[in-house]
């Protein structure tokens, strides 16, 4: 990776050093996705089946003829798919589920009920989102962990209807993971058409209140479009971008560990970005050597090598400056491999998820430590939080005033309303005060 010295860079050069690769897209993307969304909104299941055949035709041929035209998996199909999953994988899923359950169950909302002044009672309450849609991408590698990260919190939160969609044929492990997480509605549909179905509903697929899950640029664009479409009322989880990691390391860090962590993100895709920030030139050089040897053994070495071309090492004077660089970048994943990692953590202000110490690879958070791996990317961690139980609920406030409360607060409200030239607001208080004063 290219090596830069932070203190030697101008302000503009520092900004360039922390730039990400441009998001891949084309001028026709919105038009293409909008056509799919509109077709599903107007023609429902018929459009879904046409797009399934068009985009997933080869894979549809692998589905049993008895169900090749059915969008929803039957209870029998769910049981059969689950039976084909190996005991070893089931055990791994169970261990990951247990940790995710513990961490997310601890996030249960605690209501606030307080008197702000005499006779003025204010509350903050929370209720689960009634209907949620979970999108799980297809492809050669089943994203089992993503099912756990979405389905389990939705179940813990108490969402009444939990719908999962994934391109056909859905991998057995995906079906099993969904089932053990309490998902009983599983539909064979992927891509932009799946997002549109969740937003508008079809004859078979119910509309939902919020859509979660990663996907390719068509899925990402569809999520953006439906969240802004006046024909439906649906929200989405968070903006999506390429995967990324920033590693803060000092001279005590293990170069082999760091190289492995960098490559574990680089192999996600050619637009992934990895950054090493260190105050040790010998360590930086050792990491570069370790990258070369480990890269040669990777099946996805071409993808990882392309990602490394857009990545870099940044040399800093100390760990305080390292934290400053990290905060300006706002990484999706932040790994801190230093002698005193928690001291560095105290200076961190922006990160999707943080991994402390030599024995905490980013992979554990991806799969089974208990934290959620759905994280803000592309610098959004400076303002957007990682996925949590709160994302599957909505909060609302309650206020209740007694007569004494209104007498004590009314004049302030009327004064503010008058200054904002909102006389009806003022009058709503005035008529009540008049009735109290007889």
UniProtKB/Swiss-Prot annotation:
PROSITE patterns, alphabetized: HISOL_DEHYDROGENASE
Keyword presence, Zinc: yes
Keywords: Amino-acid biosynthesis, Histidine biosynthesis, Metal-binding, NAD, Oxidoreductase, Zinc
GO cellular component: cytoplasm; cytosol
Keyword Amino-acid biosynthesis appears in the UniProt entry: yes
Cofactor entry: Zn(2+)
Residues of the active site: 332-333
Enzyme class: oxidoreductase
HAMAP family on file: HisD
Described purpose of this protein according to its UniProt entry: Catalyzes the sequential NAD-dependent oxidations of L-histidinol to L-histidinaldehyde and then to L-histidine.
Protein name: Histidinol dehydrogenase
Underlying gene: hisD
